[in-house]
Design a protein with these regions (language model features):
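Short glycine- and hydrophobic/aromatic-rich loop-to-beta-strand nucleating segment
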Residues: 160-164, 214
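Paired acidic/hydrophobic, glycine-rich loop segments that form the ligand-binding mouth/hinge
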Residues: 98-101, 270-274
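Glycine-centered hinge/linker elements that transmit conformational signals in sensory
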Residues: 189-192, 226-255, 296-297
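Hinge/lid segment of periplasmic solute-binding proteins
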Residues: 104-159, 293-296
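Short helix-initiation/N-cap motifs at beta->coil->alpha
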Residues: 75-86, 105, 181-187, 253-266
């Protein structure tokens, strides 16, 4: 969430659950007294259901803070770049939002362009916010920090895991995968599940689908400075070769045009990587907990995943 001046930030503290907390530096000089009427512009993104959830939260906030008017703009975008472009347009036209919901991958860009204000003093001066901050894993907060300053609190996480079809494993006589399995074990399992027009795995060529592979191989697209490209590093090349090998061997469908989530729901793919965002889609398709489960991403050099 973004706040205007110091006292406005204090009044908005209970709206933190709306979104990532991120304060526009261009508004930081404005001081608003608690009894003044205030309008806060909120920029959010998502579908109609997500917009309704945010509006419900805003309504609850307004009940406790009748002098604060919250105006939400919810952008139904198809891509993250569309949302960022909307934000840039609002900023350059003098209509920058006070509160914004940002993905973790946008934080460095926003901080480096001096668009956000640190939240450390706000959180330290409020017991409720301090308690909320302490609920998060330190590794998660690192993504919303720069140097010694914290610029946001997440309203949710999307941890990449491998979902697998229980029935396909049962039919193939395979044990369900366990956390800590390796790339080699993953490929061997996917190969055994590939038969009769069914693929063992599907990896759509998207950032979130590919990142866990080089992350578990101790690699990244950029260096620790966040600027130096490392896309040709050994770890990334090895990850891409690993996936390309599975595609060439017929273990995975064509990655550009394949809809792995739909194929998984239709029993055409035994395993697929995703976050929790796909669960509603599968629920609507009739899948239940009896049909599938999830496991941590397979490991090459480094345990963990991406969120």
């Amino acid at each position: 969430s973004r706040y205007g001046g110091f006292r406005m930030r204090k009044m908005m503290k209970k709206a933190i659950a709306l979104s990532l907390i991120a304060t526009m530096s261009m508004s930081a000089a404005t001081v608003v007294h608690a009894e003044d009427e205030v309008t806060l512009r909120v920029l959010n993104w998502g579908n109609t259901d997500e917009e309704k959830i945010a509006n419900d939260a805003i309504a609850r906030f307004n009940e406790e803070n009748p002098n604060v008017k919250v105006e939400q703009t919810c952008v139904p975008v198809e891509s993250w770049s569309d949302f960022i472009q909307k934000w840039i347009t609002m900023c350059t036209s003098g209509e920058a939002p006070d509160v914004i919901s940002l993905g973790l991958e946008a934080v460095n860009m926003a901080v480096s362009n001096d668009l956000l204000v640190p939240l450390d003093d706000i959180i330290a001066g409020d017991e409720e916010l301090t308690a909320k901050k302490d609920q998060y894993a330190p590794s998660l907060l690192e993504g919303f920090s720069s140097g010694d300053s914290l610029y946001g609190l997440p309203n949710g996480t999307q941890t990449m895991v491998v979902y697998y079809n229980k029935h396909m494993f049962d039919d193939a006589g395979l044990e369900y995968p366990q956390d800590g399995w390796t790339w080699d074990q993953f490929r061997e399992t996917a190969e055994k599940l590939t038969k009769d027009g069914v693929y063992g795995f599907c990896f759509p060529c998207t950032y979130f689908q590919l990142t866990p592979w080089w992350s578990t191989n101790n690699a990244a697209l950029v260096g620790e400075d966040g600027e130096t490209p490392t896309v040709n590093s050994e770890g990334i090349v090895e990850a891409v070769d690993f996936l390309n090998g599975m595609y060439k061997d017929g273990i995975c469908p064509e990655p550009i045009s394949s809809d792995g989530y739909t194929m998984f729901a239709n029993n055409q793919v035994a395993m697929v990587g995703a976050g929790r965002w796909v669960l509603n889609t599968w629920q609507d398709a009739g899948l239940t907990n009896d049909d599938f489960d999830c496991v941590q991403w397979p490991v090459k050099e480094k345990d963990g995943s991406v969120y």
